[in-house]
From Swiss-Prot:
Location of the protein in the cell: Cell inner membrane
GO molecular function, one term: ATP hydrolysis activity
InterPro entries: AAA+_ATPase, ABC_transporter-like_ATP-bd, ABC_transporter-like_CS, P-loop_NTPase
Membrane topology: Peripheral membrane protein
Keyword Transport: yes
EC assignment: 7.6.2.-
ABC transporter domain sequence ranges: 2-255
Designated name of the protein: Hemin import ATP-binding protein HmuV
PANTHER family in the record: HEMIN IMPORT ATP-BINDING PROTEIN HMUV
GO cellular component: plasma membrane
Gene responsible for this protein: hmuV
Record: residues binding ATP: G34, R35, N36, G37, A38, G39, K40, S41
Stated family: Belongs to the ABC transporter superfamily. Heme (hemin) importer (TC 3.A.1.14.5) family.
Functional summary from the UniProt entry: Part of the ABC transporter complex HmuTUV involved in hemin import. Responsible for energy coupling to the transport system.
Amino acid sequence: MLNAEHLHVARDSGVILRDLSIRIAPGCVTALLGRNGAGKSTLLGALAGDLPAGGRTRGATVRGDVALNGEPLRAIDATRLARLRAVLPQASRPAFAFSARDIVLLGRYPHARRAGALAREDGEIASRALALAGASTLDARDVTTLSGGELARVQFARVLAQLWPSEDAARAPRYLLLDEPTAALDLAHQHQLLDTVRRLSRDWNIGVLTIVHDPNLAARHADRIAMLADGEILADGAPADVLRPDLIERCYGFRVRLVDAGDDVAPVIVPA
C-alpha cells in the first residue's frame, strides 16, 4: 500500500492540500480528478517522495505521513525507491538527441548489478516495454524529433521498464504515478495506454495513481476515482458511486448530465 495520512501542503500563495488522506492499493488503478490548480500534481509529488513531509522543501511546508508498503517513504533510499515506484511527470521535451531506446533504458539503471552497467537483459526489457507502449517503431528515433504523442509513449515505456517484474519478485507490490499521461495522445492511444495500465496493474500487482482530466476516461479505465477540490478529497470510491452530477459540479464548477452509452460499461458525461 502507498498511503498518505493527514497530508498538509502550503506555499506562500496559500494552502494546497488540507489534512488529506489517500491510499493507493496494489492491483488497483485510481484516477485523480480535479480542476486546474486543485493540487493534483502536488499530491502526486508528495506520494512520489519529491515533497518529503516534515518541514519546508522546494518552497513548500509539508506535514503528514507518507508510507510505502508500511515503511516511511523518507526512510527509503533513492535506489530502492526507484525500484518500488516509477513516476511519469507531465510532458517535458529532452534537450539532447538521445534515441528513444536510450530514454527507455534510463528506467533500468536502478536495477543495474553494477553502478552504470546495464546487462543484455535490460536491453531486452527495453524492447518489450517499447512494444507494450506501442512505440517499437520509434526505437532508434532521435527524441528531439518526436511529436508530443510519440514522446509520451516513449516516456511511458520508460516507466514500464523501470517497474518490469523481476524473476525473484514478480508480484512484489510496486507503484506507478502518472501525471496526465494521455494529455498529448490521440483518442486511440489514450484508450490503449489506459487499457495497458489497467491490465498491468493486475498482472504485475502495481498500484496506480493517474491524473486525468476527462472523467469519461476515468469511468472506463479506473477501479477507483478520487476527486480533489479545495485541497481536500471530495469523494473517493468506485466510478459508479463517485461520478454523480452533483459531485462533478462541486469538483469542476460545471454542470453535467449522464447519458446511457448502451454498453453496460459506464454512462457518458456531457454538459447539462
